[in-house]
Swiss-Prot record:
A single GO molecular function term of this UniProt record: pre-mRNA 3'-splice site binding
Record text on subunit structure and interactions: Component of pre-catalytic, catalytic and post-catalytic spliceosomes. Associates with the spliceosome prior to recognition of the 3'-splice site for step II, probably during catalysis of step I.
Residue ranges of the region described as Disordered: 1-61, 75-100, 204-231, 473-507, 519-564
GO biological process, alphabetically ordered: mRNA splicing, via spliceosome; RNA splicing
Basic and acidic residues composition-biased segments: 21-42, 495-507, 535-556
Keyword rRNA processing (UniProt): no
Similarity annotation: Belongs to the SLU7 family.
InterPro entries the UniProt entry points to: Slu7_dom (IPR021715), Splicing_factor_SLU7 (IPR039974)
GO CC entries: cytoplasm; nuclear speck; spliceosomal complex
Keywords linked to the UniProt accession: Cytoplasm, Metal-binding, mRNA processing, mRNA splicing, Nucleus, Spliceosome, Zinc, Zinc-finger
Protein name in UniProt: Pre-mRNA-splicing factor SLU7
Membrane-crossing residue ranges in chain numbering: none
Length: 564
């Protein structure tokens, strides 16, 4: 016992030995010295503690962090190793250069069985219990034939935070050579096109002018590059379209257009400036290059949607159950039908007024400028008729080209007019790109006209074309006639008798159906026969009327007297 006690009480001799002494309670003096030493270290008057690696320990670290647990280091040496990541708990991540192998060729098939391979197929990459091939009657281990090739097993990659987000990981730089070759082909095509165009200009004698216009070779290359689309790219050099976050150098930022802090507000998150930055400067919004983003609020279907919403509110006030968000399709169809009916009503109202009071000729009159040959434009003329002040009246130009004679014609197109057709005066031809036939063409045209005049006119087959007003009036009359016929037919006695007979048959069928339903409902649920209520045809009006007449209404206070 004495020797054992002496061993336990003896201090460790070597520096690497771990002391197994029980912790002793500190005296008041030792505790006070320890606290004073800590204060001196915090003030910088005493050197800081040093760990086993020679690193200083910050004296301001709290004790519950700097104190070492007994199960980590029983020697109680000052250290912060327990606060650092433990090596045995660190995950082993794959390096940045590791990636899945692509395009790996299968190895050559073995001719004899190898030790440790699958007994069923002979592959080295798996065992018999993991084999996915059909179980053979005699395995490859015993036959040594039809040995399957070894599968290529991809590595199990485990990347850290940066490795998972590395977009270039696994990229083969040799793939970029394909793009380089493609650009080289485009460059060769440019040079070929340039050489071909120079040859054409040299042959036509325009080479000097080209050399004077394009002095540098770079400008010439840009000229040809604008005409050729790059592969996979559709770019128009005349309309430079930029992305939202990319601006050209000449563009002015929205927040720099007006430096007054009380001007239009610029939202940096959405990069939007709703109001006009030049509102308080007195500039016309039509003259400035940028007048705010509020114009976007009135583009697209915004106005039509606002009109639909207004129609929904008005229809709801008048008793129609429509809502823009709840029933958008119903509201859209209702609004379209409303607009059509409104236009028809206006047209009918206009027609009725014109029929009653007349005045259609005033609506077909030409504009006042053409009718009175005067405008509000001020023009001052001299004594000789020349314009002194104002803009001279433009001479009306013909829509046809003047003084252009084609296909041997001696007159221009439009020099001849007959029966609403334009033609050539030289040959009376009404085909624009026809060849001139001269006097012979005139004689043929006159002979055809005389032949048509000699033929008897069949006036009964010739009908004068009707105007839109007459066609609309005829349609309205036909609608009224149809309505009158329907009302007269429905009031006839024969139709009424037929309807009564059909209704009687429908009532009998409905009573039979109700009796059948009553019998089925009296049976047990498990003994009821299968009865399908599916009907392919639509019920007639008489069947619906019979169903309504025979239907029981529990809410009706007189329903209890029906069976009496």
């Amino acid at each position: 016992m004495a020797s054992g006690t002496a061993v336990n009480a003896a201090p460790s001799g070597g520096p690497g030995d771990v002391s197994l002494e029980e912790p002793k309670k500190m005296t008041r003096e030792d505790w006070r010295k320890k606290k004073e030493l800590e204060e001196q270290r915090k003030l910088g008057n005493a050197p800081a503690e040093v760990d086993e690696e020679g690193k200083d320990i910050n004296p301001h670290i709290p004790q519950y962090i700097s104190s070492v647990p007994w199960y980590i280091d029983p020697s109680k040496r000052p250290t912060l190793k327990h606060q650092r990541p433990q090596p045995e708990k660190q995950k082993q991540y794959s390096s940045s250069g590791d990636w899945y192998k692509r395009g790996v060729k299968e190895h050559s098939i073995a001719t004899r069985y190898r030790k440790g391979a699958c007994e069923n197929c002979g592959a080295l990459t798996h065992k018999k219990k993991d084999c996915m091939e059909r179980p053979r009657k005699v395995g490859a281990k015993y036959t040594g034939m039809n040995i399957a090739p070894d599968e290529h097993v991809q590595p199990q990659l485990m990347f850290d935070y940066d490795g998972k987000r590395d977009r270039w990981n696994g990229y083969n730089p040799e793939e970029h050579m394909k793009i380089v070759e493609e650009y080289a082909k485009v460059d060769l095509a440019k040079r070929t096109l340039k050489a071909q165009k120079l040859q054409e200009e040299l042959a036509s004698g325009k080479l000097e002018q080209v050399e004077r216009d394009h002095n540098s070779e770079d400008e010439d290359e840009d000229k040809y590059a604008d005409d050729i689309d790059m592969p996979g790219q559709n770019f128009d050099s005349k309309r430079r379209i930029t992305v939202r976050n990319l601006r050209i150098r000449e563009d002015i930022a929205k927040y720099l257009r007006n430096l007054d802090p009380n001007s239009a507000y610029y939202d940096p998150k959405t990069r939007a400036m709703r109001e006009n930055p030049y509102a308080n400067t007195g500039k016309n919004p039509d003259e400035v290059g940028y007048a705010g983003d509020n114009f976007v609020r009135y583009t697209g279907d915004t106005i039509s949607m606002a009109q639909t919403q207004l129609f929904a509110w008005e229809a709801y006030d008048k008793g129609s159950e429509v809502h823009l968000q709840a029933d958008p399709t119903k509201l859209e169809l209702l609004y379209k039908s409303f607009k059509v009916k409104k236009e028809d009503f206006k047209a009918q109202q206009k027609e009725s007024i014109l029929e009653k009071y007349g005045g259609q000729e005033h609506l077909d009159a030409p504009p006042a400028e053409l009718l009175l040959a005067q405008t509000e434009d001020y023009v001052e003329y001299s004594r000789h008729g020349t314009v002194i002040k104002g803009q001279e009246k433009a001479i009306a130009c013909s829509k046809n080209e003047e003084d252009v004679k084609i296909n041997n014609h001696t007159c221009i197109w439009g020099s001849y007019w007959k029966e609403g057709k334009w033609g050539y005066k030289c040959c009376h031809s009404f085909v624009k790109f026809s060849y001139c036939t001269g006097e012979a063409g005139k004689e043929i045209a006159n002979a055809e006209a005389n032949l048509l005049e000699e033929q008897p006119r069949e006036e009964e087959h010739m009908t004068k074309p009707k105007t839109l007003m007459e066609i609309h009036q005829e349609k309205q009359k036909e609608k009224k006639k149809k309505k009158h016929k329907k009302s007269s037919n429905s009031d006839s006695e024969g139709e009424e008798k037929k309807k009564q007979e059909k209704l009687k048959k429908a009532l009998n069928a409905e009573e039979a159906r109700l009796l059948q339903v009553k019998e089925i409902m009296q049976l047990d649920e498990r003994k009821r026969p299968y009865n399908s209520v599916y009907e392919t045809r639509e019920p007639t009006e008489e069947e619906m009327e019979a169903y309504r007449m025979k239907r029981q209404r529990p809410d009706d206070p007189m329903a209890s007297f029906l069976g009496q």
